[in-house]
Amino acid sequence: MSAARIALDTARKVSKSRDFWILFGTFFVCGLSTNGLIGTHFIPAAHDHGMNETVAASLLALVGVFDVIGTIFSGWLTDRIDPRKLLFFYYGLRGLSLFLLPSILFSTMHPSTLVFIIFYGLDWVATVPPTIMLCRHVLGVQRATVVYGWVFVGHQVGASVAAIGAAVLRVKLGDYAIAFYISATMCLVAALAVLRIAKGVNAAILRG
């Protein structure tokens, strides 16, 4: 079977799974709240509050530094803790931090802003190891990489929605506050949604 046929056949099978759509939806929120919102709009949002663009860009660069640490540590945790619980905390804390963000942006680098940057860096790709683990355990090991590929589509769609949507809200409303609050709310919904993912491998889906 060709690679394209395997990908399409896997999509057909996992599309019947509620757990797949939960993973797809929560990864949509992941992309929305990272690359789409913070990655694209943090610098202009900080600039709206009077922060120099170079300072804002430096803070965003720190996200990348702490991202490496957070991802490695999350992989270690995923081998030891229920990945659903990890995702609950990752999305939940991300949502709470986004609710706070509009109130901690200042014209200079405030300590509270730096704390946000460090946390967001640690959390940025921390969702990936437990998501991959759930693709393996819930939907089967045989095509786990293909399943994750389809879940990653949700991530990229979410990123594009936030990149465009936050810009529209900024133009219409004059600031990014509502965009941050919407993203925060979606993160909290994602945190609750992952707890509904079943335990064990749903082998029947991959056979059907």
Locate each region found by the language model:
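Extracytoplasmic gate region of multi-pass secondary transporters
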Residues: S15-S74, A162
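Hydrophobic core of transmembrane alpha-helices in multi-pass small-molecule transporters
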Residues: F28-V29, S112-A126
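Helix-to-loop junctions at the C-terminal end of transmembrane segments
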Residues: T71-D82, R170-V171
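Cytoplasmic membrane-interface "Motif A"-like loop-to-helix N-cap segments
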Residues: R80-G92
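C-terminal ends and interior cores of transmembrane alpha-helices
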Residues: L93-F106
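Intracellular juxtamembrane helix-capping segments at the cytosolic ends
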Residues: A126-L139
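A late C-terminal transmembrane helix in Major Facilitator Superfamily
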Residues: V138-L173
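A membrane-interface helix-boundary motif in multi-pass transporters
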Residues: V168-T185
